[in-house]
Amino acid sequence: MPFIGADGFCSPIGENWRSVVTSEFGNRIDPITGERRGHTGMDLAVPTGTPIRAALPGTVTVSTYNRGGYGYYIMIDHGNGLSTLYGHCSQLLASVGRTVKAGDVIALSGSTGRSTGPHLHFEVRVNGQRTNPRSYLP
């Protein structure tokens, strides 16, 4: 069941997202290298196969695999310079060009790419600039 806030923004994993944040946006200790570096999104620990939902209505612009980083991932353009990214998925369910509504299942969570365990890496971009997803989630 989608969890959609008053502004129409949907949590990609449901209403319990606050209890499963394992890495915030911003500087952190990289779990693979142990070095301090920026983290471009928010990591939400969920079991492999958890349905991932579109945060807002929009059009899928990327649905592919990136070996060195996001693994299987999807990007959605929501218009007005706003886009979201969903990384480390085990399965992609939405192809490029598909129009989605807030709450539509677009992928299943996983641990593909540069990952230490099953989770969703969730990004929000405004005019191409990564911004803190916590500011948008309901």
What are these regions (language model features)?
Residues 1-71, 102:
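Surface-exposed, glycine-biased beta-strand/turn segments
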Residues 44, 73-76, 101-113:
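Short hydrophobic beta/alpha edge segments that flank linear recognition/processing sites
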Residues 26, 49, 65, 77-81, ...:
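Solvent-exposed coil/turn segments that connect beta secondary-structure elements
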Residues 23, 46, 62, 88-91, ...:
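A residue-level detector for short acidic-glycine micro-motifs
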